Amino acid sequence: MSGEAKMRRATPADRDGIGRLWQEMMEFHRECDPRFFQMKPEALEVWLKHFDECLADQNQFVLAAEANGELVGFAMGRSSDDPPVFDRPAHGFVTNFAVTEPWRRKGVGQRLFGALLEEFRKRGFGELRLSVSALNPASNGFWRRMGFEAYSVSMRRSTG
């Protein structure tokens, strides 16, 4: 593995490569929390349709990290609003973010986040939000290093 990853806008030609990265990301999440991250057999097909819709939607965007002609990471973001009772402007929301395992801890994630942050700034957002599993210490640490802080806690329980 040599060379440096370059950040760019994703295109329809990236569909399969980003799909593979998404599958790797979901497997990583499933290992952290197998109860929550159970996928349907058609999950990839459904997600790829979502990817296509994101590329066509002005309120969403997809970035790719590429090294040596290979996709090594991707990020997705969208605009998001709070309920209308709050006096807060719309904010950016990070919907997906992944770097393939061999390229982690080499600065790719930090640079990909920098490109993501710049895209949100260009779109006029003053705040970003995201969700991260409490059972995923690696991702929690990464997002804290990127300047995020917890402001809400989601909880769950079985009805049984």
Residue ranges of model-derived segments:
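A short, internal acetyl-CoA/4′-phosphopantetheine-binding micro-motif in the GNAT/acyltransferase core
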Residues: 81, 94-104
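Conserved acyl-CoA
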Residues: 100, 111-127
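Conserved active-site alpha-helix within GNAT-family acetyltransferase domains
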Residues: 110, 122, 134-152, 157
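Glycine-rich phosphate/pyrophosphate-binding loop shared by adenosine-nucleotide-utilizing enzymes
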Residues: 5, 69-74, 92
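Conserved GNAT-fold acetyl-CoA-binding loop/helix
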Residues: 26-50
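A short helix-loop-beta-strand connector motif used in the catalytic cores of GNAT acetyltransferases and
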Residues: 49-63, 93
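Conserved beta-strand in the GNAT
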Residues: 64, 70-79, 98
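Conserved N-terminal entry element of GNAT/NAT acetyltransferase domains
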Residues: 1-16
